[in-house]
From Swiss-Prot:
Domain MPN stretches: 129-266
Annotated compartments: Cytoplasm; Nucleus
One Gene Ontology term from the biological process aspect of the record: positive regulation of protein localization to nucleus
Keyword Zinc-finger: yes
InterPro entries: MPN, Npl4, NPL4_C, NPL4_Zn-bd_put, Znf_RanBP2, Znf_RanBP2_sf
Protein name, per record: Nuclear protein localization protein 4 homolog 1
SUPFAM superfamilies tied to this protein: Ran binding protein zinc finger-like
Source organism (scientific name): Caenorhabditis elegans
Gene: npl-4.1
Length: 529
């Protein structure tokens, strides 16, 4: 029996691919070359992916992660056997030291972390964030437009090679999942997500994963013109200290699995996107990551936000417990005389913790998930999850209305909707088995119309879910648009059997019940009159 390694413990496919690439940047023969075509000189020899002059020429602020690894491997010399050059930052005590009693009764230089000197990170794990289409983010922003409250979501997609940066990686966003949250005009509070494992299982079936998170910070300037205030800039802040700490916590929850570290993980590819006003006072998207040093400080729980200055963080002075150790943190800056001086991290500017990641949309929009192409199919949209606060509910009438927009041979288009698939696995009425969901997800990934139609005809859980939706949400749809049981009749609102027969068919799920029963033994709904 072969056990499959979970997605969270596997080296990402893009890392496997990039590790096999040469990475050398080819340069054509230039005007200064004085040699035949087949020869090379210093003007046209290939350069390394971490070449500083090339990166500066192309205006690339940070080298890619794999270019950083190549630089470290190259600096060791060809005779070395060192293949794991990455070492994780550590800001907490090393546990289980045999040389002394546990802290605070004992400590030594082996288990004590070094003083942290903050440096701006020269590489980034992700070089670009590409949101597939405009409709994706407009649907996310609709919550703020309708309520005036801020919103947070997880970016769903995958990591792919980014050709514009040597050995680069881009996070491609195909959908946005909105978790349970308490939204306010000036903030957001995460709530417990009881469906987290179920959702991650669905993402694995779809070949996708959480690649980052997005939140809004929008303040209306003129509602008639649709403008928003420009609040995040070089004279204020780009990410607040509290947001940096949250980003670091999420990055620590989504480590970057790599074979180049003895710990088998180093940093994270998890990105942060902020939707806020830009110079033109329109909503724009800005991408970031926090540095590995920041993530290590947050993991050690030594970093906290300041009260009135969002651009400053603060290293704790008082331990949270007797066993909590706080290491010293310092950073260098120029004083009023232009000299480099070391400063204590109480407080420290969050700009030392940030790594910019460009975010945008492609010229040609792409749709991993869509809702048909006709005007009719766009008249009803399947509601986004966890939007009860603004009156948008999934299931019931919404499920009926959305399903009625598609004919029986358009079930593939109906199912190619992330929020619809999410509802199938998270609804509390009918639990659809993993086997059936895997079959549907495979059809969606391959865009296999025949398999999708077979699924709609054969999956009894889907039939029961639709029956309950009609019972709870009302039915006014054409019977031809309602799913059909193979070799049976369409679902209808009335019983096809009477009380005088030996059995009666439930008008909601078509299950045959004994005549003596007053309710259906399958779905529990009462017999129709």
């Amino acid at each position: 029996m072969v056990l499959e390694v979970p997605q969270t413990e596997r080296v990402n496919d893009v890392d496997v691919f990039l590790s096999t690439q040469d990475g050398q940047i080819q340069r054509p023969k230039g005007p200064n070359c004085r040699h035949p075509v087949r020869q090379k000189c210093t003007n046209c020899l290939p350069v390394d992916p971490f070449d500083e002059e090339y990166l500066k020429e192309k205006d690339i602020k940070h080298m890619s992660f794999h270019a950083h690894v190549r630089k470290l491997l190259g600096s060791q010399g060809k005779g070395t056997t060192l293949k794991k050059p990455l070492e994780n930052f550590r800001c907490s005590l090393k546990p289980n030291c045999d040389a002394h009693k546990p802290f605070p009764k004992g400590i030594c230089t082996k288990c004590k972390p070094q003083v942290v000197t903050l440096n701006r990170q020269k590489f980034r794990h992700v070089d670009n964030i590409q949101i597939e289409n405009q409709e994706l983010v407009n649907q996310f922003l609709d919550y703020w437009r309708l309520s005036g409250h801020q919103r947070v979501g997880f970016l769903i997609g995958q990591y792919q090679p980014h050709l514009e940066v040597p050995l680069g990686i881009k996070a491609t966003v195909a959908a946005i999942y909105e978790p349970p949250q308490h939204c306010r005009e000036d903030g957001i509070e995460f709530l417990e997500d009881k469906n987290q494992k179920t959702i991650d299982n669905l993402l694995e079936m779809l070949g996708l994963q959480r690649v980052g998170w997005i939140f809004t910070d929008c303040w209306t300037a003129n509602s008639a013109e649709g403008t928003v205030h420009y609040t995040r800039h070089k004279d204020s802040f780009f990410l607040s200290a509290e947001e940096c700490i949250t980003a670091a916590m999420l990055q620590n929850q989504h480590p970057n699995i790599t074979e180049y570290s003895m710990d088998r993980h180093y940093g994270s590819k998890f990105v942060t996107v902020v939707a806020s006003g830009d110079e033109s006072m329109h909503v724009n998207f800005h991408g970031y990551q926090v540095s590995n040093q920041c993530a290590a400080m947050v993991e050690a729980d030594i970093l906290c936000p300041t009260l009135y200055t969002p651009e400053l963080a603060y290293v704790r002075e008082t331990p949270l417990s007797e066993e909590h150790y706080i290491t010293d943190v310092q950073f260098s800056m120029k004083n009023e005389y232009g000299a480099e001086v070391m400063k204590n991290g109480r407080p420290l500017p969050v700009e030392y913790l940030l790594v910019d990641v460009p975010a945008g949309m492609p010229k040609e929009p792409h749709y991993t998930f869509h809702v048909g192409t006709s005007n009719k199919s766009k008249s009803a949209k399947f509601n986004v999850e966890n939007r009860q606060a603004i009156g948008q509910l999934q299931g019931g009438a919404n499920l009926i209305q959305y399903s009625s927009e598609f004919s029986k041979n358009q079930f593939l288009e109906q199912a190619t909707n992330f929020h619809f698939l999410l509802y199938l696995v998270t609804n509390d009425q009918v639990q659809i088995s993993d086997e059936w969901m895997k079959r549907l997800c495979d059809a969606v990934k391959a865009q296999d119309r025949g398999t999708a139609m077979e699924w709609a005809q054969e999956c009894e859980d889907w039939h029961q879910l639709m029956a309950l939706a009609h019972a709870n949400g009302g039915s006014g749809n054409d019977v031809s648009d309602i799913p059909v049981i193979p070799n049976g009749d369409p679902f209808s609102g009335s019983s096809s059997g009477g009380s005088g027969g030996a059995v009666w068919n439930c008008g909601h799920c078509t299950f045959q019940n004994e005549a003596a029963r007053q309710d259906c033994s399958m779905c529990g709904l009462p017999a129709a009159d």
